[in-house]
């Protein structure tokens, strides 16, 4: 009864908060989502505390119920984060938000079976929305020039044909003879929680650059699953001030890294293979590795987010040319195929979803996405 009573109170509270915030969410999406996430995180902490309660440890009969609560909570959080990444407009998608409201109502009554059933329905509706967004991207394909060649320099939006399908790509090429790749960060040193963030436009301006792309994966503040580590990241990164972020916890890291130095670029298969040389311009560890030696190095894995179609950012090189860009309506595996078709030598996947942002010559050509703790910036030498 203690478990059911506490979770009943938690669920009712979440439901009331959700209903209160829904109307204003249409106008102030970012701030409201952050508020809801913060409160969801507090409730998650209460659930974790309950797990460690003496009564739980002594009464094995409660174990199944607690697992059921945790499973339903985790699934609800996953759906919530999917909606955040899609930046769904409530006014145009009332059905999806009504379903989410219904799920919270079931949770408030302790009806976990019905909540789980409706979470499966919600997942299908979210996938349907993704398909709708994908069809809009298909229309955009008709409006771009088709080319399977990379630009020699500057920015291009073009259609690349791969296996009978055309993918729209926004791509910028720059010579490393005249361009330096740097990383701008909001924090001056390692940060594990409540880390500062900024817009890509600000990072480009701060670095005196002419273009920029969002960086590797991080833990967004609006994700309930990021409680206690908001806006932090754990991969190796060297910024323009020659500071190595997360140096100590990447001694054995298998995450690949891309290093820019002078007029050249190189890949290392594992961050642990790289020292802490500050004579280079930048070090960017991200995953997965897409291409190396002109060959595809990524095979489909069990990460469902990588198999969903969406706008996906990348950083790449060929010879003394650096490329940054976004492939539209593609899975990670399809991005690798697109870049191989373009003759790219080496490439890393960057963060995607709500973080996808690409800035060229004073304007966004993708995004603006959410604010992030870092940005990759191209500057003239």
Model-derived features with residue positions:
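Short acidic-glycine loop/turn motifs at beta-strand connectors
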Residues: 175-178, 220, 239, 259-265, ...
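Acidic, low-complexity intrinsically disordered segments
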Residues: 1-34, 38
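Zymogen propeptides
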Residues: 2-17, 117-120, 124-247
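Active-site-adjacent helix-turn-beta-strand microarchitecture at beta-sheet edges
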Residues: 218-296
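Amphipathic, heptad-repeat alpha-helical segments
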Residues: 21-28, 32, 40-100, 104-106
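Short glycine-rich loop/turn motifs
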Residues: 166-171, 254-255, 309-314, 373
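Conserved, well-ordered active-site substructure
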Residues: 225-246, 300-350, 355-381
């Amino acid at each position: 009864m203690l478990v059911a009573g506490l979770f009943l109170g938690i669920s009712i509270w979440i439901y009331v908060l959700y209903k209160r915030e829904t109307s204003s969410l249409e106008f102030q999406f970012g701030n409201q989502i952050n508020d809801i996430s913060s409160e969801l995180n507090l409730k998650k902490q209460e659930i974790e505390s309950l797990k460690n309660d003496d009564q739980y440890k002594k009464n094995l009969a409660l174990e199944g119920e607690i697992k059921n609560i945790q499973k339903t909570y985790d699934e609800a959080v996953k759906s919530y984060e999917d909606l955040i990444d899609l930046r769904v407009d409530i006014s145009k998608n009332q059905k999806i938000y009504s379903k989410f409201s219904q799920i919270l109502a079931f949770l408030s009554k302790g009806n976990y079976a019905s909540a789980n059933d409706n979470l499966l329905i919600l997942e299908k509706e979210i996938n349907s929305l993704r398909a709708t967004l994908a069809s809009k991207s298909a229309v955009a394909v008709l409006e771009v020039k088709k080319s399977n060649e990379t630009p020699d320099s500057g920015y291009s939006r073009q259609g690349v044909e791969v296996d009978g399908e055309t993918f729209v790509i926004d791509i910028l090429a720059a010579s490393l003879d005249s361009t330096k790749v740097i990383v701008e960060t909001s924090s001056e040193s390692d940060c594990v929680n409540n880390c500062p963030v900024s817009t890509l436009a600000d990072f480009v301006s701060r670095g005196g650059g002419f273009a920029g792309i969002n960086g590797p994966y991080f833990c967004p503040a609006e994700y309930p699953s990021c409680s206690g580590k908001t806006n932090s990241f754990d991969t190796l990164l060297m910024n323009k001030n020659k500071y190595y972020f997360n140096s100590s916890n990447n001694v054995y890291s298998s995450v690949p890294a891309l290093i820019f130095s002078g007029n050249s670029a190189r890949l290392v298969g594992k961050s642990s293979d790289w020292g802490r040389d500050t004579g280079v311009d930048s070090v960017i560890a991200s995953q997965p590795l897409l291409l190396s030696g002109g060959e595809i190095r990524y095979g489909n894995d069990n990460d469902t987010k990588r198999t969903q179609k969406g706008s996906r950012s990348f950083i790449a090189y060929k010879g003394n040319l650096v490329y940054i860009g976004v492939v539209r309506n593609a899975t990670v595996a399809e991005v690798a195929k697109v870049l191989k078709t373009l003759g790219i030598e080496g490439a890393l996947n960057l963060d995607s979803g709500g973080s996808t942002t690409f800035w060229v010559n004073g304007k966004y050509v993708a995004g603006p996405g959410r604010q992030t703790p870092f940005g990759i910036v191209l500057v003239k030498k």
